[in-house]
Amino acid sequence: TYPEYWAVQNFTSYNNGGYGVIVGNPDLKPMREYSAQLTYVLKNKYVFRGWFTHTDDLFMQTLYQQPDELRETFKVMNFDFQQQAGLMAAVPLKLGKWYSANLTALGVWLRQKDSDFYDIPFDRDIVYGMFTLRNDFHISSQPEITLSVNGMVRTKALQADYDLPASGNVDAALQIKFLKNKRATLKLYCADIFETAQINPYINFKGQRLDMDMSSYRHFGVSF
C-alpha cells in the first residue's frame, strides 16, 4: 500500500497560529502487509474468526512536540512494523417473534514499534476488546413497526504515542412500514443518545504531554 501523494511531497504548512506545523516526508516507503485468517461457522449461524497480521513499514500521521520551541510537528512516518492478532465471535439471538439481535465480541492484541521516532523510540502493545449489540424489537406486524437499539463499547487502545480512552455509543431508531405491500417507510432516529461516541486522545509518553478535548453530539433525524 502506497502513501497518499500529498504525504510524500516536500512541504511545510503552519496551523494553530504557527504553533503547529505539518511537514511532508519524501522518504516515505510503501507498507507491506502479511496476514492469515481462519473462520469457523457453527450450525450455519455462529461465526468465529481468528487472525494475525504483520505490517512492515506501517505509515501514519504522528505528532511530536519539539523540545526546544513551542511547536507541534505533524508528519506521516514509517514505523518498523505493526502486529495484530485477534479473535471474533458473532452470535445471533432471538426470542419468539418479537425480539432478534446480534452480539459481536472482539478481542485484539496490538503491537507497534518505531525505533527511530525522533528521540523517543517506542515499542508499545496493548490488549483491548470491542463489543457490539444490535437489537430489533418487533412491536407490530400491521403496520410493521420495529424499534432498533444498537450499542457499542471499546476498551482502552493505543496508536503510536497516543493513548485512546475507552469509548462507546448507543443509537436508536423507530421504523414504520405501511400502505399496500409496505411500500412506504417512515423512520425516526437518534444517534449517539448519550453523547459518548467521541473520545479524547492524549499523549503522556517520555516527556511528551498532550490532552485533547473533543465534543460528541446527539442528533435526531426523520426519513420517509
Give, region by region, the residue ranges found by the protein language model.
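Outer membrane beta-barrel strand-and-loop segments of large Gram-negative receptors
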Residues: V23-N25, K29, S35, V47-T104, ...
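Outer-membrane beta-barrel translocator domains and adjoining extracellular loop/strand segments
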Residues: Y5-S13, G18-I22, T53, L58-P67, ...
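In a subset of proteins, long, contiguous C-terminal domains/tails are tracked
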Residues: Y40, N44, M88-V108, I199-F224
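Surface-exposed loop/turn and secondary-structure junction residues enriched for glycine/proline
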Residues: V8-F11, P26, M31, T62, ...
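Conserved C-terminal beta-signal and adjacent last beta-strands/turns
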Residues: R124-F224
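Transmembrane beta-strands of outer-membrane beta-barrel pores
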Residues: T1-P3, Y34, N44, F52-D56, ...
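Structural signature of Gram-negative outer-membrane beta-barrels, strongest in the C-terminal barrel
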Residues: T1-D56, P143-N150, D163, K182
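Residue-level signature of outer-membrane beta-barrel architecture
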Residues: L38-L42, F52, A89-K97, N135-I139, ...
